[in-house]
Structures are given as structure tokens and as C-alpha cells.
């Protein structure tokens, strides 16, 4: 009796493991059958049978379980290597669990109680070989870098190339993109690849503007400060402006516009609460510029002089309650002569909109005589939304000078009182680029609402959407336009600020415009005419839109691009074989014909997703080295059209980029979601984010490295370097160091522009989804500054921090 009891106890462990294997096999069998019926891989069905039978044999105490498990593990290893090669993160869901169970089966407590006619050394040996082979595959994968490009820039300058951006002191950062050209290039050289590792915190300032219960989920700290006029100017999500001492971070003055909820109970229902920046205008900068003044208008001339004298240096603040406010940059007091006691009400001639449904999240463009502003329009609410009009005001008086409405593009004469701009015309919510020498403003354009249905779009709205339009600064008339997505059904707004630089080409130096896009193309055109510098090809695109809509037969693609390969079933990922299998089932259940697969009732995969390869963070360039520094991200989304009769039952939407979007007035609402596993992880395999550099003289990628860790986005804070998405921009320096803070983990990082080597990282107290900047303080020290306030949509930690770093003394 005691012998039987001991035998039962000794078989307990293999029996329990057998039950577990059998249950896993049954679960995989159900999913495997589903996947096969969808035309997917046979592996999961066959592996389910093998692992399930191994479990049953273990429960029966049969030694044959080891031999069968060895066969299935060996076959799984061969299959995994055939699918993905030596890619560690791709091998994890395919082999890690089965490898671990194989090791457990080799333990004496699990294998010794087993009996049968098979030789114990043979079955144990076979399993040992299978385990070793799987382990060797995992070990070998540690020495590979799939998706990366290793290279080195072989120059510090291209002969004859200079920085032709608007002049300013080297130590200043006067515009959102440092200059109106949006290049984000600083001529500072104190920080170099040799000393960047010595960067340390210099000071920290807290704005006090922290998201509260009454704020929208998409409350974001996306501000890039300005350093000019001996001060550092910051704006906060609730449109406060704070002037800081650039050396110490101490507050000099603060302006709070006390934004209105626009008759709502609070801000919670708003799509966004964002201020990406303010704009600066200095009369002295134009003092030597010839001006044209009309002797016939002495009153206007006198008013301009009065405004200039009272606010010779001014900041322009777009507020979340739809105002444009002019502030004295020295004191923070409003410039009373601008508009109505310092403010222009941007609601004029716009018509009705929901609270928070229209305002500028981005800084206006400022020229010698004008301040020019666009506006954010909440996506996918209805077909009756505010106009995307661009308005130019006198920089001193706030008088409307011209307006360009893409729904009425020929008439730029200031609109009459009582009239309304074209409803629902394509808008420009991002940042302008300006070339005052050429007399042009460059607009990165969005599209007509809703994003995923275009059956009722007008000819004008189609013409000017999802591309770049160049306007004459003085008149607002169109000089040229280029479209980068035809009949956009995927929310492929041009989100980033266009970048202006002189580019060395085979035909000589040309004034270029670079437009980074969500699709991954970087379009390079002559900014005088819009003609190609880098070839742009029209490629066939998938068809088959829903009834009432259509697709464009072709879509443009630049020869300079960071477009990822099309997804396949084998690209689906998970932590375990089970969530990976479910992702494969999801992939095969959705429509996917490659990039530009149209939205569908079935549900379609959008890849790259509407966060883009490049979003509003854009790119930075080094005009001397003739390179671009990039932070591409790769995340798939899904887009499922829903008949309007079903939309109301689905409840309110979660946000502007997820959940059901009502699209009132259109035949369909739409459900937008990232393509995630049941565990909330991306269904596509990592890496999801990189840093890269492109040689603009030949359009070759010099280097490309995965970037960022999952430390702050996984349940266990382990800094696994998987390459995570980033949202926000970069900047480069003459010292050869580039900076980025927008990754999902809370770090500001420095990189060697020659080879992409990470030189340093500084821990941030909150998410850094913004664009950092650099300047020289009054003490002659180079500082790097970033706002760390988090991003609601990405779920990064919220805060109210401005952090400055410098080299250790």
C-alpha cells in the first residue's frame, strides 16, 4: 500500500503537467481550426494535436510523451526558423513556452515516474537534442539585428553648403522649429559625441498646470519652448504662457488667459487640450527692411506705429477657447492695440461647433507684417464642422488682411461680417513653414471630415487635402500645391511642419521643401514651384470602397521613404503562442491588401497606422552635413465602418483616434483601434520604433537602429530594448549630436549623427512626447530643454515639468 501511495505521489507532477499540456492543446486546437478555415497557417492545428497527445501520454504516465514532445518541439523550431529566422522577439512566442516545458520534462521528478516500452535514454536523449536546438536558435538570435542598418557618415560637412535659414543669434531658438524654415538645426557645438555622456540635470521647473478630473483624456504637453529676448517662453496645455530665466529656470512672469469652457460644464468632452507653442515677433529684426507705406493712409500708419511702440517684442498665443492673443514679450501684459484689447476672436465667421471643437493647437506663423493661423477641427464628429480656413492678421493691429479657405480658394479678400467660411473644408492644424525671401507660406494640409468616408467631398476639398499648399504671403493666393494622398480615407494628414533647406543635387543647389508623411514617404520638392527634386512615382492602389465612395487608382510614393514592408500573417506577434495565434486569426479576419486598403464593413488594417511613420513631430535636418535625422514609428491600426443605424447603440467614443466615431451626416460611423492582442500588446512584431539618418545627397539610409524600451509601458518595469513608438520631434546640432524625447519610456536621449550610437540618456519624471530644443544661456552654457508632461492618448505618465540639462562642470 505504501508502495502504491509513493507511486501515485511520484506521478503527480507529470500528471499535472500533462493536464496543463492537454488543456493548452485543446485551446490551440480550437484556434488552429479557426485559423485554417481563414486560410492561415496549419502549424497551430498540427502543434495542438502533438502537444495535446503529449499531455495525454503524460497523464497516462507513458514515456512516449517525451519522444512525441521532442518531435513536436523540433518541428516547432524548424517552423519558427523558416518563418522568421534568427529574430529573438519573433522566436519568443513561437518557442519560449515549449522550450521551458521541454526543460521541465527533462527534470528527474517529471521523467523518472514515466514507464513504457520505449527506451528511457532514447526518449530523454531525443528531447535533450530538441531542447538544445531550440536553445541554440534562441542564443544565435541574440547576435542578430533584424530591421537595423549599420553604417557611418563619412563627412562633417558637404563642401560649399551653408545654413541658409533666417539669421538669428546661434544661441537662440526663436520659432517652433528654431527658425521659420522648420529645420530644427542648432549651430551650437559645446555638446559633442565625445562629451555628451557628461550631461546632467541643470534645473527643473514645474508649471503647476496638471491635468485634472475635468480635463479631456487627450490632455497633452507637446510644447517646444522658445529662447529669445533673454528669456525662455513656455506654454502649457491650458494655454498659460510662462517666461523663465534660461540659466536658472526661475519664473519671470506668467500670463493666464483663463480659458472658457465655451458653455460646457468642464473640458472633459473636448478632443484635445494642447499648446504646442507660441510665436515671437520683434520689430527690431525688420528695422533695416524697406517698408512700403501709403501716404494716403496716415491713420493706419499711426495705429501701426503706436502698436509697435507699446509692444516692440511680442508673443502670439493661440488659446484652447479659440482666441489669438498678443503679449508683450518683455512683461507678459497684453498688447492692447492688437484686436480687441489684445485678442482676436477666432470664432468670427466660423459658425457653430461643439465646445473645444475648433481652435489652434499649434503656433501661428509670423512674418514681417502678418500673423497667420490655421485651426484644429475635431475628427469624425460630423459632416458639418468648422471651416479649415487660414487667416492672416496684421501683426500689430490684429486686422484681418486675407483669408484662404480651401473650400473657396480663389477669393482671399477678407470675409464680410455675417458671412461664414465654407463648412467642413480641409484644415491645417500643424505648423507652417515660411520663406519670406520667396514670399511663401507652406501649409501641411488635412482633409475634409470624416476621415474614412469621402463620398461627398467637393472638387476643391479633394484638390487641397493631404498635401502641401504654398500660399503667397501678401495675398493668400495659391502659388502651388502637391497632394501626397489621393482621396484620403485613412486620416493621412500631413502632420509635420515642412522643412526648408538648400539641397545639393546633381543639378546644383536647389531650395528644397521636405514633407514627412504618415505613410513614411518624405517628399522632396523645389519650394519655389513644387516640382520634384526626389522622384515621386504613382503606384497602383487597392480598390473596393464601400457603396457611395471610391478609391483613387494610384497613390504617390517618394523614392526617399521609410515605408515598412507590407504585413503578413507571420508578422503577427504575442508573448505566448496563444495570443500570437489570436492575432493571426484577427489578421486573417480583417481586410488587408497592403497600404491604402480602403475602410470596410468587414474591418480593414491600416498600416502604417494613422499615428503614422511620421506625425506632427516631423523631421530635423543638418544643412551642413546634408542629412536628415528621423524617428520613424510602425504601428498598425484597424478601421471598421459601421452603418449609422448601429452607431447610436455603441455609446460615446473613447477618443479622437480610438473607439466608435459617429460621423453624423455620413452613411457610416467608424471604429478605430490599434491592432492589439488580447493582452493589450501590439499584434505586430517589434521593433515598433527606430532612429535613423538619411543622406540627402543620395537618399540612402546611413543607419537605422531600434530605439527605446518597454520600461514604462509594461506591467514589470524592465528596460527591454525592443524599439518603441515615439511621438514628438528631434533636433540636430553642429556639434554632431541629435536629441529625441518622444519614446514611450521616459527618457531624453542623445545620439551621434554619424552612426546613430546612443551617447546618453536622461530620465524624465513624466512622458516626453514633445520636441526638445537647445540654446545658450546668459552664462555661455549650452542647455538642452524638454517639457515632460505626458500624453493622454499614449497613456504616458502625466506631469508639468520643464527640465534643462547641461554638461557637468
What are these regions, as identified by a protein language model?
Residues 180-186, 209-215, 242, 451-452, ...:
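Short, solvent-exposed loop/turn elements at domain surfaces
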Residues 1-152:
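Topology signature of small-to-medium multi-pass alpha-helical membrane proteins
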Amino acid at each position: 500500500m505504501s508502495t502504491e501511495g509513493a507511486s501515485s505521489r511520484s506521478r503527480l507532477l507529470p500528471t499535472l503537467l500533462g493536464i496543463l499540456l492537454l488543456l493548452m492543446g485543446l485551446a490551440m486546437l480550437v484556434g488552429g481550426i479557426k485559423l485554417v478555415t481563414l486560410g492561415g497557417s496549419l502549424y497551430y492545428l498540427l502543434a495542438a494535436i502533438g502537444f495535446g497527445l503529449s499531455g495525454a501520454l503524460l497523464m497516462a504516465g507513458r514515456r512516449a510523451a517525451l519522444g512525441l514532445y521532442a518531435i513536436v518541439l523540433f518541428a516547432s523550431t524548424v517552423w519558427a526558423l523558416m518563418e522568421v529566422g534568427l529574430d529573438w522577439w519573433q522566436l519568443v512566442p513561437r518557442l519560449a513556452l515549449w522550450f521551458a516545458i521541454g526543460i521541465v520534462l527533462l527534470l528527474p521528478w517529471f521523467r523518472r515516474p514515466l514507464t513504457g516500452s520505449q527506451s528511457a535514454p532514447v526518449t530523454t536523449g531525443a528531447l535533450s537534442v530538441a531542447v538544445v536546438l531550440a536553445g541554440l536558435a534562441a542564443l544565435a538570435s541574440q547576435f542578430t539585428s533584424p530591421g537595423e542598418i549599420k553604417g557611418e557618415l563619412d563627412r562633417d560637412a558637404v563642401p560649399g553648403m551653408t545654413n541658409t535659414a533666417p539669421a538669428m543669434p546661434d544661441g537662440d531658438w526663436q520659432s517652433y522649429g528654431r527658425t521659420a524654415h522648420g529645420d530644427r538645426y542648432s549651430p551650437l557645438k559645446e555638446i559633442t559625441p565625445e562629451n555628451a555622456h557628461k550631461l546632467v540635470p541643470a534645473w527643473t521647473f514645474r508649471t503647476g498646470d496638471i491635468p485634472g478630473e475635468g480635463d479631456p483624456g487627450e490632455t497633452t504637453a507637446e510644447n517646444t519652448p522658445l529662447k529669445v529676448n533673454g528669456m525662455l517662453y513656455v506654454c502649457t496645455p491650458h494655454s498659460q504662457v510662462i517666461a523663465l530665466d534660461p540659466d536658472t529656470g526661475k519664473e519671470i512672469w506668467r500670463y493666464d488667459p483663463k480659458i472658457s469652457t465655451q458653455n460646457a460644464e468642464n473640458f472633459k468632452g473636448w478632443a484635445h487640450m494642447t499648446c504646442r507653442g507660441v510665436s515671437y515677433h520683434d520689430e527690431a529684426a525688420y528695422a533695416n527692411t524697406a517698408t512700403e507705406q501709403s501716404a494716403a493712409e496716415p491713420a493706419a500708419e499711426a495705429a501701426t506705429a503706436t502698436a509697435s511702440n507699446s509692444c516692440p517684442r511680442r508673443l502670439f498665443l493661440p488659446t484652447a477657447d479659440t482666441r489669438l492673443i498678443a503679449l508683450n514679450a518683455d512683461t507678459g501684459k497684453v498688447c492692447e492695440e492688437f484686436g480687441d484689447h489684445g485678442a482676436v476672436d477666432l470664432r468670427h465667421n466660423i459658425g457653430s461647433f461643439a465646445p473645444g471643437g475648433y481652435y489652434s493647437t499649434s503656433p501661428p506663423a509670423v512674418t514681417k507684417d502678418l500673423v497667420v493661423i490655421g485651426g484644429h477641427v475635431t475628427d469624425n464628429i460630423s459632416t458639418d464642422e468648422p471651416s479649415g480656413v487660414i487667416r492672416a492678421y496684421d501683426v500689430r493691429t490684429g486686422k484681418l488682411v486675407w483669408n484662404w479657405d480651401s473650400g473657396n480658394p480663389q477669393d482671399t479678400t477678407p470675409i464680410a461680417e455675417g458671412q461664414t467660411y465654407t463648412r467642413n473644408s480641409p484644415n491645417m492644424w500643424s505648423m507652417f513653414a515660411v520663406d519670406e525671401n520667396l514670399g511663401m507660406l507652406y501649409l501641411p494640409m488635412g482633409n475634409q471630415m470624416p476621415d474614412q468616408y469621402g463620398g461627398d467631398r467637393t472638387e476643391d476639398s479633394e484638390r487641397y487635402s493631404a498635401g502641401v499648399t504654398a500660399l503667397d504671403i501678401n495675398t493668400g493666393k495659391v502659388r502651388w500645391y502637391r497632394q501626397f494622398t489621393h482621396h484620403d480615407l485613412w486620416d493621412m494628414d500631413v502632420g509635420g511642419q515642412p522643412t526648408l533647406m538648400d539641397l545639393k543635387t546633381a543639378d546644383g543647389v536647389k531650395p528644397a521643401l521636405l514633407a514627412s508623411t504618415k505613410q513614411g514617404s518624405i517628399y522632396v520638392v523645389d519650394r519655389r514651384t513644387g516640382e520634384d527634386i526626389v522622384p515621386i512615382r504613382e503606384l497602383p492602389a487597392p480598390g473596393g470602397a464601400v457603396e457611395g465612395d471610391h478609391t483613387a487608382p494610384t497613390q504617390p510614393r517618394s523614392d526617399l521613404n521609410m515605408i515598412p514592408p507590407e504585413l503578413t500573417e507571420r508578422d503577427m506577434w504575442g508573448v505566448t503562442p496563444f495570443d500570437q495565434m489570436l492575432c493571426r486569426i484577427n489578421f486573417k479576419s480583417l481586410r488587408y491588401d497592403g497600404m491604402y486598403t480602403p475602410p470596410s464593413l468587414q474591418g480593414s488594417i491600416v498600416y502604417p497606422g494613422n499615428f503614422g511613420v511620421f506625425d506632427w513631430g516631423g523631421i530635423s535636418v543638418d544643412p551642413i552635413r546634408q542629412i536628415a535625422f528621423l524617428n520613424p514609428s510602425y504601428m498598425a491600426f484597424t478601421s471598421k465602418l459601421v452603418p449609422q443605424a448601429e452607431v447610436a447603440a455603441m455609446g460615446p467614443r473613447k477618443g479622437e483616434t480610438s473607439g466608435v466615431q459617429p460621423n453624423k451626416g455620413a452613411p457610416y460611423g467608424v471604429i478605430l483601434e490599434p491592432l492589439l492582442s488580447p493582452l493589450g500588446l501590439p499584434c505586430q512584431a517589434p521593433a515598433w520604433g527606430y532612429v535613423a539618418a538619411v543622406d540627402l545627397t543620395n537618399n540612402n539610409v546611413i543607419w537605422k537602429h531600434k530605439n527605446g524600451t518597454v520600461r514604462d509601458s509594461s506591467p514589470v518595469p524592465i528596460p527591454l530594448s525592443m524599439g518603441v513608438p515615439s511621438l514628438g520631434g528631434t533636433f540636430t546640432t553642429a556639434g554632431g549630436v541629435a536629441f529625441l524625447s518622444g519614446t514611450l519610456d521616459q527618457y531624453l536621449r542623445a545620439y551621434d549623427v554619424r552612426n546613430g550610437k546612443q551617447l546618453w540618456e536622461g530620465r524624465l519624471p513624466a512622458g516626453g512626447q514633445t520636441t526638445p530644443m537647445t540654446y545658450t544661456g546668459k552664462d555661455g552654457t549650452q542647455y538642452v530643454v524638454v517639457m515632460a508632461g505626458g500624453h493622454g492618448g499614449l497613456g504616458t505618465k502625466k506631469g508639468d515639468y520643464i527640465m534643462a540639462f547641461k554638461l557637468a562642470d
